[in-house]
């Protein structure tokens, strides 16, 4: 406004409810909708009869391939996952590490104020965060507890019923597989990271594709490698719009810092994620562009 924008260019609802959101989207004064949120909200935006740009959820894997520069890869993952307490939708939800460098990875990441839960603590963490323990009878009903979103690792641990050092940045949990049986391989929007071992390159890529297809279609996937051919194979296999190579996925996904992606916190997932856009949404998507077609005998 101080720079000359219209006085009412930014408005908001004090009343937080689906009814209020629906009423706003259907208001005759609204021309276009940019919807960022859960699948239900995005679907509602698309069905309200107006032009809508909806973006989807992410479930981002970081494949740590054996040829990577390991100290850099670990630093990138910690830097990315700890930023804003893991709230960015492009942040890593699981590190998938080749078996040849798994022990070295574990040793390196523990230098960064990262806490690995034991079996009992993992069950407590799953119960608090998702209401279900891995491989339990009700595991398919697991649903993220919204109270954990953006909370510090120390708070999450305390609420789950165990203690971590006061300077803990990230809570890590070793998981056996990707999918409903392991709730911590879901999107967590918090400084909690699943860690899985890959038997070989094909297994690492398979687990990464499973992560993306486990409620994160079209969003993002990261790989740390010095093998360009493996990077290409990974990119072709993952149904993700953004393939982030050798960079923190949070900052790689939202663009500008580590690559040439358009800077944005609104990340389209394309047809993979049932979105109308597949790019990083910016002002270009929200303006009308007039064109004059002057006669030219081509």
Predicted regions and their residues:
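General beta-strand structural signal in soluble alpha/beta enzymes
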Residues: 9-14, 34-37, 52-55, 97, ...
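Short, surface-exposed amphipathic charged segments that create phosphate/polyanion-binding patches used
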Residues: 24-28, 69, 131-144, 184-186, ...
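Conserved active-site and cofactor/substrate-binding residues in soluble primary-metabolism enzymes
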Residues: 15, 19, 28, 36, ...
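Rossmann-like NAD(P) dinucleotide-binding subdomain of oxidoreductase/dehydrogenase enzymes
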Residues: 1-72
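Short glycine-enriched loop/turn motifs at secondary-structure junctions
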Residues: 27, 55-57, 87-91, 186-191, ...
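ALDH superfamily catalytic-core signature
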Residues: 42-179
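Conserved C-terminal structural/oligomerization subdomain of aldehyde/semialdehyde dehydrogenase
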Residues: 162-298
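Buried hydrophobic positions in well-ordered alpha/beta secondary-structure cores of metabolic enzymes
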Residues: 10, 33-34, 58, 98, ...
């Amino acid at each position: 406004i101080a720079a000359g924008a219209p006085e009412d260019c930014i408005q908001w609802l004090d009343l937080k409810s689906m009814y209020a959101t629906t009423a706003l989207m259907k208001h005759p004064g609204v021309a276009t909708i940019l919807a960022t949120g859960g699948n239900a909200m995005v679907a509602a935006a698309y069905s309200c009869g107006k032009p809508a740009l909806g973006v989807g959820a992410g479930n981002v894997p970081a494949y740590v391939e054996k040829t990577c520069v390991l100290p850099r890869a670990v630093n990138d993952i910690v830097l990315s996952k700890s930023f804003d307490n893991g709230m960015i939708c492009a942040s890593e939800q699981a590190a998938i590490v080749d078996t040849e460098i798994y022990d070295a990875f574990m040793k390196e990441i523990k230098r960064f104020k990262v806490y690995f839960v034991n079996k009992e603590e993992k069950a407590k963490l799953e119960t608090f965060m998702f209401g279900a323990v891995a491989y339990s009878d009700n595991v398919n009903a697991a649903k993220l507890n919204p109270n954990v979103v953006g909370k510090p690792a120390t708070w999450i641990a305390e609420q789950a019923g165990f203690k971590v050092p006061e300077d803990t940045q990230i809570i890590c949990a070793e998981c056996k597989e990707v999918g409903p049986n392991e709730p911590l391989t879901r999107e967590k929007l918090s400084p909690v990271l699943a860690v899985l071992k890959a038997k070989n390159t094909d297994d690492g890529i398979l687990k990464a594709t499973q992560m993306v297809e486990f409620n994160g279609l079209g969003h993002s996937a990261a790989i740390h490698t010095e093998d360009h051919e493996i990077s290409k194979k990974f990119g072709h296999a993952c149904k993700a719009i953004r393939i982030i190579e050798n960079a923190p996925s949070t900052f790689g996904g939202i663009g500008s810092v580590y690559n040439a992606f358009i800077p944005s916190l609104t990340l389209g997932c394309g047809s993979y994620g049932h979105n109308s856009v597949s790019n990083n949404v910016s002002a270009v998507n929200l303006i009308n562009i007039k064109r004059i077609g002057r006669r030219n005998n081509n």
